[in-house]
A protein has these predicted regions:
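Aromatic-lined, polymer-binding surfaces characteristic
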Residues: 2-150
Length: 150
């Protein structure tokens, strides 16, 4: 875990190869949004390795940086899960997030359900329709949904 935690610190430092800049307000974060959404899942699934050992200063800096992507724009498809995962993780840790935007994205994702386990990935059915919605939706529901929406 030490290697990964060091990389998290480096992503906050300009001039390092892994530096991640702030995302301009409401701008689509592109591929960085995807990567940070995955990072939020890592924090969620293994906090004892990736999140808990970090200093409060690093946690706070990661929250600001990652929320600039999570609260930013997204593509109108399964990518909404990346925003949702980022915002939900930091909300669960006591950070302020745009709850209205989070709820809006969740409602849109729920509306994509077409029955019998199928979701459309706006506007098509594609390979994400058969796994991304089920996996990300189930993880979100188990880790956050029961807590955040209660």
């Amino acid at each position: 875990g030490d290697y990964y935690r060091r990389q998290l610190e480096l992503m906050l430092q300009p001039g390092t190869p892994v530096y991640v800049p702030m995302n301009p307000p409401k701008k689509n974060g592109g591929q960085r949004l995807v990567e940070l959404g995955g990072l939020a899942l890592s924090f969620m699934m293994a906090p004892e390795i990736f999140w808990n050992p970090l200093s409060q200063e690093v946690k706070d800096s990661l929250a600001v940086r990652m929320l600039s992507y999570g609260e930013g724009g997204t593509y109108e498809c399964n990518w909404r899960f990346f925003n949702v995962n980022i915002m939900s993780f930091f909300l669960s840790q006591g950070y302020h997030t745009d709850k209205a935007y989070l709820e809006e994205l969740l409602q849109i994702l729920l509306a994509a359900y077409r029955g019998d386990g199928w979701y459309h990935d706006n506007p098509l059915f594609d390979y994400y329709s058969m796994w991304a919605f089920q996996m990300y939706g189930s993880l979100w529901s188990e880790k956050f949904g029961k807590k955040i929406l209660s």
